[in-house]
Amino acid sequence: MPHRPIGVMDVGGSHVTAALLGPSGAVAERRDARLDSGAPRERLLEQLLAPARELARPGLSWAIALPGPFDYPAGVGTFAGVGKFQSIAGVDLRFAVSAALGTSAADVHFVNDAIAYGIGEWTADVERATRFVCITLGTGVGSSFLDRGMPVESGEEVPPHGWAFLIEVDGQPLERSVSTAAIVAAYRRAAGQSRQVREIAAAASAGDPVAESVFVRAMETLGAAIAPYLSRFSTDELVIGGGMARSWSLLEVPLRAGLSREYRHLADLRIRPALLGDEAPLIGAADWVTRTTGN
């Protein structure tokens, strides 16, 4: 947890949140704003930094969680292939943040948003599992593999870069089977009508067999896809976060079935839904910076 107040930001494709965390690690103040990730450079930077400007104070360190592709040590992103943030590709964001918020460039730090989310969830459990995996389900599939709260991004025990979305299922990216778009598409094929994920989840909870089968298939697929990595990683705890985790009652049983299909020992793996909601990446970014810099 921070030894002194720290500023944090969580940047998404359509939103930005800035917050101040106190020495206890709890969110003391926060500001939220909409973000147009396709805006021209100057307007995008203004939108990006506006919430943080309201909280800025001299000498404050900032931890910023945002998606890649991004060179986090350098503070520069390419954002290749994501269709977002193209106007600030190649921009030195460390300098931009430093200048806008009146702090030293050395006090501006960047971390992957999925890693920040996972670290936040890792801190939420008093037991703090040694080998911890967090999978976030929403428009995509995010992931973090943590060893004592620090990210593991290479080696045979994790997917390339620690990114679960690079796992393939039948030659296709995992997100083609497990994401909000995948759920919507699968339901449309099976039921012949379009519904949003929350509507499909409500229908499944009410006993709609078509809606239920869509969730079962997706979660069994997810479990089977990540099981080899959870086994190699000697995972102690798995957390499922993101928007789809709100439908936990629909997810847990088929997820466990998929995990243990070929890896029987994973049937007893500790699994839980995320606890912190949208505060997870804020708390995680602060914790990561505090432990990596000693501040």
Language-model regions: role of each:
Residues 1-2, 6, 86, 101, ...:
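Nucleotide/phosphate-binding catalytic cleft detector across ATP-hydrolyzing
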Residues 21, 109-111, 115-122, 246, ...:
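Glycine-rich phosphate-binding/hydrolytic loop that grips phosphoryl groups
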Residues 41-46, 58-61, 70-131, 249-262:
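Glycine-rich phosphate-binding loop and adjoining helix at the ATP-binding site
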Residues 14, 67-70, 138-140, 244-245:
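Short glycine-rich anion-binding loops that position phosphate/pyrophosphate groups of nucleotides
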Residues 2-66:
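Conserved phosphate-binding loops in N-terminal lobes of ATP-dependent enzymes
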Residues 31-58, 173, 182-239, 244-252, ...:
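Adenine-nucleotide phosphate-binding core of ATP-dependent small-molecule kinases
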Residues 6-10, 61-63, 131-136, 142, ...:
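Short glycine-aspartate micro-motif
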Residues 19-21, 30-31, 38-42, 88-89, ...:
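Glycine/GP-enriched mid-protein hinge/lid loop-to-helix segment characteristic of carbohydrate kinases
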